[in-house]
Each structure stands twice: as structure tokens, then as C-alpha cells.
Amino acid sequence: MRRGATGSSRVPAAVRISLTPKTSEFFVLFARAGENALAAARLVERRFREHPNSDVTQEQVKAVETAGDTVTRDLIQLLNTQYVTPFDRDDIYLLATEIDDVVDFLEEASDLLGLYGVEMPTPHAMEQCAIIVEAVDHLATACQNLKGMRGVSQALVDMKSLEDKGDRLLRDALASLFRDPGIDPLIVIRWKDIYEALERALDACETAANVIANIVVKNA
């Protein structure tokens, strides 16, 4: 579900706002969103690693993406109907949509793998996928621990390190494409698109980490 499809953090006039705190439901849903993002990352990594003989299908990846959309909608619906929230409303909305973006971009990269008829993934792509799995694992840990904030700061540090590593890897991957004078231009286009979709997933993970960092500071 792309940004904007989830709605707004503003409460529509027709929505009934509950004055009974349901703060624990936010933590449950964020934990579920993190788990779903990790499931997507692992599926996509396996699809790339085992391609073209992987038994992971694009339909399976899409199903996880759809499940993530449902969690995002549930979070925003809860946000729009609760007067009392565990932390800043804008941060809740941003975190929900950034986690959703992680899964969306992973699904896009997986889809391009099939659409472009890629015969064999490159080592760069497989390394990107491995970095994403590790980063999303830390994101899922942070989401699981939002309620008590235990271990969240270390997870954020680890994610930042992986994002820096991913940035360097993307530059190397693109350079390797343009360094070969005899490469088919179509191959350059295909892999540039796939590399950049994977990088967008990692960037969304970093943005989610930044939102969590703001939450930690505001609630210290």
C-alpha cells in the first residue's frame, strides 16, 4: 500500500473517538507490523538467493505485502479513534507508513525479478537482500520492544550501520554495471531498477528507525 493510500492521521468528523485508553493495542499492532516486514524480507531474500529455482512465488510475497497493508490500516484506524495514544500521533502515523513502505519496496523488487526475466541474480543483489534481512530484523526487534524501550537504542545503532553499508554496496553495484563496456544496455536498466528498489526498502527501514529514535527521545 503506497503512501497516501492509508489515509491521514487526522480524524474524520464522522469517526467516534474513544476516551477509553487502548494503548496496548498500538504495541501489539506495531509488533505485528515488524514481524510481517521481517517475513517479507526473508521471503524476498530467499527468492533472490534460490532464483530461478526458488519455490517462493511472487504470489507469496504479495500475500505478505497485503497482510502488511491490513496491519497498517488497523493502526491508522486505531489512531483515528483513540483520544489517548502511547506517543505522538504523528510519530505513530509515520512509523506505521514507513514499515509499510519497507514491505512495498521489497515486493516491488521481487516483482521486477520476474517481470524482467532475470536468469540469475547478481552477487550485489544477494548481498543487498542479506543486509535488508538483518536491518529489518533489528527493526522488528525495536517494534517488539516499543512498550518498554529495552534494547531499542542498540537496534537503531545497528540499523544505521547497515544502512551505511547498503549505501556503499549500491554505489559499487551501479559502478559495476557501467564499468563493463560490453554489457547489454537492457541488463543495465533491469539491474539498476532492481538495485534501487532494494535500496528504497533499506532507506524506508532507516526512516522508520529515525522515527523510533524520535519516539525514544520524546519519551525519555
Language model features: what each stretch is:
Residues 2-220:
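Cytosolic, long alpha-helical scaffolding segments
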